[in-house]
Regions:
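Conserved hydrophobic helix-helix packing surfaces used for dimerization/oligomerization
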Residues: 154-156, 177, 286, 310, ...
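Residue-level detector of alpha-helix initiation sites
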Residues: 93, 160-161, 185, 292-294, ...
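Rossmann-like dinucleotide-binding cores of NAD(P)H-dependent redox enzymes
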Residues: 176-179, 183-213, 219-220, 299-346, ...
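Feature captures the FAD/FMN-dependent oxidoreductase FAD-binding
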Residues: 148, 153-157, 205-255, 346-358, ...
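Glycine-rich dinucleotide-binding loop and its adjacent helix/turn
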Residues: 130-148, 209-227, 250-305, 403-417
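FAD-site-proximal beta/loop scaffold in flavoenzymes
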Residues: 259-283, 367-432
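Ferredoxin-type iron-sulfur electron-transfer modules and their immediate structural context
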Residues: 1-150, 241-260, 349-354, 380, ...
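N-terminal Rossmann-like FAD-binding beta1-loop-alpha1 element of flavoenzymes
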Residues: 153-178, 295-303
């Protein structure tokens, strides 16, 4: 095990030793610093010079928001960081966060032609961060100026990546936007759902402050659809409504209630909102169920909080995991064990205290997942569930919005079956759990809403 993760002092062996403050302050600071530091000026210039500036750039095609990647990299090479940032942010107003969290290895960097001969793409994500970081440190004059006020009002419900992108584009186009969110802070996944070491020093909120500075966006937090807000009332009051609700429902193990078992998303949110990581309790033996990015974030942060033994357990093989190969490698580098082909079957507790979790070994037979008859038992005083989330359709209150596969059905522009209502992000059928795709959903919906309002 890495020495950077060792507790301050050994404690008596207790299967239920779940507590905060396992490490000393210096170790917490080290563990939760920026996990992937930015390029310095020299590194950025060298990397920018590696770009071929392709005319028909496959990297741009692979970017869900269509950022003109060759242009922004050329501007970095020319020393024009503000121009580079503008090229990025005009297509992706959350370009700073996306530079930190995008799985570039399976998007733009995978498409880079440098892979053909060198097997090493241009580090597009780090270059994007270099440009946007420089801009946010010294924004100067506004990059974007609002068009003349159209007199139209649009309600945007949900201030995650899709809602923020939609609100920003609508405001730039001259519409008045009221941005609602159920939580005390804006940002959605970017604020509550990502590992703390991916976005340090409050960057998510700093980017949102810049996004709102364009003007024309009124913010109302602690307003949830189905609680303070109702779709019929919104449709009556506003000229258009965009639903960027995300996935608020949590899938459970179905093994009954047990202290020590909690949702991984809630665990990550608690850590992101904590004044200090020292305030967050963690077990000594942590098992994370799931195979996506959330599972990796929860597992790695468990190690960084001082857990001695952390395992990710996934019911299928490595190739089926939602977490990218880079994320899986990152987990292993941080001392996380990844176990494949095992499905949770029972929790073991004694005296109401979680002691472990039992698994059935699995395999594929005829394309179906089956149990092999073999078993696996792991010691655990904390189990984190990262087995997916679901859309809570009841918030729509039978408001005439058609669902498909449990999510909101839309056309290619984000229009729902109900007049005046658009949707995007994870709540839209076909949406993937990627910040950059949610941003594109919001942007395209805003353009569609704008066309609709101008034609009316």
């Amino acid at each position: 095990m890495s020495s950077t993760m060792n507790p301050v002092a050994p404690t008596a062996h207790l299967a239920s030793d779940v507590r905060a403050g396992r490490l000393d302050p210096a170790q917490y600071a080290k563990n939760f610093c920026d996990a992937h530091p930015p390029l310095n000026v020299v590194q950025a210039n060298i990397e920018a010079e590696r770009c071929y500036y392709c005319y028909d750039a496959p990297c741009q095609t692979a970017c869900p928001t269509g950022i003109d990647i060759p242009t922004f990299i050329r501007r970095i090479a020319d020393g024009n960081l503000r121009g580079a940032a503008r090229t990025i942010l005009e297509e992706n107003p959350l370009g700073g966060m996306c530079a930190r969290v995008c799985p570039t290895e399976v998007l733009c960097e995978q498409a880079c032609v440098r892979n053909t001969n060198e097997s090493k793409p241009v580090e597009i994500g780090l270059l994007q961060r270099h440009a946007t970081d420089a801009f946010f440190e010294k924004p100067g004059t506004p990059l974007f100026v609002r068009a003349a006020d159209t007199g139209r009002r649009v309600a945007v419900v949900g201030a995650g990546p899709a809602g923020l992108a939609c609100a920003h584009r609508l405001a730039v186009l001259g519409h008045q936007v009221v941005l609602f969110d159920a939580r005390p802070k804006l940002g959605g996944l970017n604020e509550y759902g990502l590992a703390s070491y991916k976005t340090v020093n409050g960057f998510a909120q700093r980017e949102i402050e810049w996004l709102l500075s364009v003007g024309g966006i009124e913010v109302r937090c602690n307003h949830a659809l189905g609680r303070e807000l109702h779709l019929d009332a919104l449709a009556a009051e506003y000229d258009a409504v965009f639903l960027g609700l995300g996935l608020a429902g949590v899938n459970t193990l179905g093994l009954g209630e047990q202290a020590g078992v909690r949702d991984a998303v809630d665990f990550i949110a608690e850590l992101r909102q904590a004044a200090s990581p020292a305030d967050v309790a963690i077990g000594r033996h942590v098992v994370v169920i799931g195979g996506g990015m959330t599972a990796v974030d929860a597992a790695v942060q468990s190690r960084k909080l001082g857990a001695e033994d952390v395992s990710i357990v996934y019911r299928r093989g490595q190739e089926s995991m939602g977490a990218s190969a880079d994320e899986q490698s990152w987990a292993k580098e941080n001392g996380v064990r990844i176990i494949h082909w095992a499905a949770p079957k029972a929790l073991r507790a004694k005296g109401g205290v979680l002691r472990g979790i039992d698994f059935a070994r699995t395999a594929l037979e005829g394309g179906k997942l089956v149990e092999t008859g073999e078993s696996l038992a792991l010691q655990a005083d904390m189990v984190l569930c990262a087995i997916g989330q679901s859309f809570i359709a009841t918030v729509l209150e039978d408001g005439g919005v058609q669902l498909q596969g449990g999510r909101i059905s839309t056309d290619t522009e984000g229009r729902s079956s109900r007049s005046k209502v658009w949707a995007g992000g994870d709540a839209r059928f076909g949406g993937r759990d990627l910040t950059v795709e949610a941003v594109e959903d919001g942007k395209q919906a805003a353009l569609s809403i704008d066309r609709h309002l101008r034609a009316a």
